[in-house]
Curated annotation (Swiss-Prot):
This is Large ribosomal subunit protein bL19. It comes from the Bacteria. Keywords: Ribonucleoprotein, Ribosomal protein. The gene is rplS. The lineage of its organism: Bacteria, Pseudomonadati, Planctomycetota, Planctomycetia, Pirellulales. PROSITE patterns: RIBOSOMAL_L19. One of its GO terms (biological process) is translation. Gene3D superfamilies: 2.30.30.790.
Length: 117
């Protein structure tokens, strides 16, 4: 009984058109930012290094290098603040979590590109 109610609430909080992307993909995350009484869209570009959770609580982590420093941001997949997620490039990976990219610098961070036919 309790699980059925939780599943119903979980489905109600999920987006109908959730973004489709995989770990290793280079993505543009368009998120709504509220500054004072104005709302604008901020784009964060980087490599998806992991996904965690399930259902409405699912999160994904995006990593990029800014001015020589690694920056990681976690985004909820089903958040109303996420406008859209664009896949710029698909990467080939054999791991679910790409935390080893944290230790790499420069061209070593690049992943092989998956060819889409």
């Amino acid at each position: 009984m309790n699980n059925a109610i939780m599943d119903m609430v979980d489905k109600a909080n999920q987006k109908e058109n959730a973004p489709q992307f995989d770990i290793g993909d280079t993505v543009d995350v368009h998120s709504k930012i509220l500054e004072g009484n104005k709302e604008r869209i901020q784009v964060f570009t980087g490599v998806v290094i992991g996904r965690s959770g399930k259902g409405a609580q699912e999160m994904f982590t995006v990593r990029r290098i800014v001015a020589g420093e690694g920056v990681e941001r976690k985004f909820p997949v089903h958040s109303p603040r996420i406008e859209k997620v664009e896949v710029k490039r698909s990467g080939v990976t054999r791991r679910a979590k790409l935390y080893f990219l944290r230790d790499r610098v420069g061209k070593a961070v690049r992943l092989k590109e998956r060819r889409r036919v």
